[in-house]
Amino acid sequence: MRKKVSSSGDEGNNEYKKGLWTVEEDKILMDYVKAHGKGHWNRIAKKTGLKRCGKSCRLRWMNYLSPNVKRGNFTEQEEDLIIRLHKLLGNRWSLIAKRVPGRTDNQVKNYWNTHLSKKLGIKDQKTKQSNGDIVYQINLPNPTETSEETKISNIVDNNNILGDEIQEDHQGSNYLSSLWVHEDEFELSTLTNMMDFIDGHCF
């Protein structure tokens, strides 16, 4: 006889217990892993009578019961490593945790949200001001200028802008010639060809 399947598609969903784990449940899970090893988490409920689903058993072991999980506060070295990895990987906590020995993705995520994100919120502003890695620049008025000078400098005639754009192409050759001074005949001929190309004489 087939088991009744709930609307969510999980078999025997009502059989599993949710919420905090007890000391007795932890001991059952640890004894099972010691005897059978990790993996096949869905078999634990059948073989041990533990009323927990396979996913719950796996997460409990990986995040709390495994002897490889490091306890205690994060060190400065771990903080620095997490910050560097987060700049590269973003919020990919499982990938970050794999590169932080002894820490789980759950530990790293919680520590980031409760400590590092707030800490970096203060440091980011200081860092951006000190290292110069600013993408957008804000042009502030020169403090030595008077208010009238600032207003005059900010007024731009549309006709002048259009005139500058029209003259740009005609001044291209003069601009290049002002940057280059050659005495060698070959270099002079090469430069002449470049000037002709800019002026539209070469096809």
Swiss-Prot record:
GO terms for cellular component: nucleus. Residues 13-65, 66-120 form the HTH myb-type domain. The keyword Signal does not apply. Keywords: Activator, Developmental protein, DNA-binding, Nucleus, Repeat, Transcription, Transcription regulation. Restricted to roots and hypocotyl. Specifically expressed in root non-hair developing cells (atrichoblasts) at the N position. Also present in lateral root cap cells. In hypocotyls, expressed within files of epidermal cells located outside a single cortical cell equivalent to roots N cells (at protein level). Induction: Transcriptional activation correlates with reduced histone acetylation on H3 and H4 mediated by HDA18 in N cells. Repressed by CPC in hair cells (H position). It is found in: Nucleus. SMART domains: SANT. The keyword Protein transport does not apply. GO terms for molecular function: DNA binding; DNA-binding transcription factor activity. It comes from the Eukaryota. Residues 41-65, 93-116 bind DNA. One of its GO terms (biological process) is positive regulation of DNA-templated transcription. This protein is called 'Werewolf' because plants lacking WER exhibit hairy roots. Interacts with GL3, BHLH2/EGL3/MYC146 and BHLH12/MYC1. Transcription activator, when associated with BHLH2/EGL3/MYC146 or BHLH12/MYC1. Involved in epidermal cell fate specification in roots and hypocotyl. Together with GL3 or BHLH2, promotes the formation of non-hair developing cells (atrichoblasts) et the N position in root epidermis. Regulates stomata spatial distribution in hypocotyls. Binds to the WER-binding sites (WBS) promoter regions and activates the transcription of target genes such as GL2 and of CPC. PANTHER family: TRANSCRIPTION FACTOR MYB8-RELATED-RELATED, TRANSCRIPTION FACTOR WER-LIKE. This is Transcription factor WER. The gene is WER.
